Amino acid sequence: MIKEIQIENFKSIKKMKLELGRINVFIGENGSGKSNILEAIALAGAAAAEKLDNEFLAARGIRATEPRHMRSALQTASAENKIVVAVKARDEEAFEFDLRHDEKPYSSWKLERKTDTKISVEGEQLVVFLEALLANRRTALERVTGENSELLRAEIRELESYLDDARNPNIEGDPANKLQLRMTGPVFPYSGSSRRSGLASIREFLIYSPENSSLRMFQREGQIEPLGINGEGLFKFLQVLDSDQQHAGVVKNISMRLRLLDWYVDLQVPSADTSHTNSIEISDRYLSVESGTLNQVSSNEGFLFLLFYFSLFSTQLTPAFFAIDNVDASLNPKLCAHLVSELATLARDNGKQAILTTHNPATLDGLDLNDDDQRLFVISRNEEGETRIKRIQQKEGRASTMKLSAAFIDGYLGGLPKNF
């Protein structure tokens, strides 16, 4: 899990530190910078995956625009001003992503290489990590000359020495247990063989913003798999879950949670092998036998949003760390509160970490602020226009007599307009 994120010089953010839990809810005025925080994290993820072209940024949910609009406009704009995102995981893995853009036509953001980048890899992941990194360095050696070539050769020799030690079960000391490297080039794609490691989860970070049209058109698939940021790929994903023995029971568990909807009875997903139908069957307890079942086209959009959220949180096939922008969209206020409570349980059970933004006060009532893994943040802008963040905590030893939704509406939490 990600423990801490620091952001500098990104859009409305001059400098900010964010300490995360497992489920994190952002509230704040329109334009306060909630989405800017999410986009800065997604930009770091794109840098970690070495995919900084605009088409890859958009696929992650980033509003890619001119470089001068990506940098903070709160100071004099210059190509020399870099965007910085520093990430620390709970296992103390840490990276700093320094990004620059030369503002030339058709150019893309570049990750500034730092000679003191550190990475820690432990246990059985060590050999896999070193083999992948060595293959990358040997390929890179074929494309460089001069001083860079000598640096790479020295790096390769050091890596080969570490790899020999790591393969030796009788070796004692650091190489067998924990490795720290100072590299001249990118190591992000090889950090943490496990998809659940902190920095691997940054690489996968997406900003989901499901759309009604994408959820209803089950034949549409997105650039990102298994689930696109607007909900693309949901039908195929359900088919995979339903047919894969390794994920037996996941669809049944999703179906059980969908009973938050009073009318809902059951869900049937056609097999990918035996059916050419791109639709699911939804049982409504109020429908007569003659009327049959609903499909995704005739169902209400709230059902589709819940189906997407529960699918996203219920399996290791989806990212470990992600955001959902406007999680309250299309949902009844009371349902929003129950949804957040359900997502907190699913996140804990399936190793997920999420940031949710909302404008619906009722959403907050699903949070248990006595649980340190569930956190509420108010996003605002100061007199200079800088985005600021404040965590709302339950006072120790004191039970709240007011619902969070009421505290939000009455202005006790902040995050409301002050100009009217």
Show which residues each predicted segment covers.
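Short loop/turn elements that form and flank the Walker-type P-loop nucleotide-binding site
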Residues: M1, K14, E19-G21, L317-T318, ...
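Pre-Walker A-like glycine/lysine-rich segment at the N-terminus of P-loop NTPase domains
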Residues: M1-E50, F56-H69, T76
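Residues immediately C-terminal
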Residues: S12, A329-S330, T363
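Phosphate-coordinating catalytic segments in nucleotide- and nucleic-acid-processing enzymes
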Residues: A48-F308, L312-L317, K395, A407, ...
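C-terminal lobe/lid and adjacent interdomain/linker elements of RecA-like ASCE P-loop ATPase modules
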Residues: F56, R60-G61, R71-S78, H338-F420
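Walker B catalytic acidic pair
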Residues: D325-N326
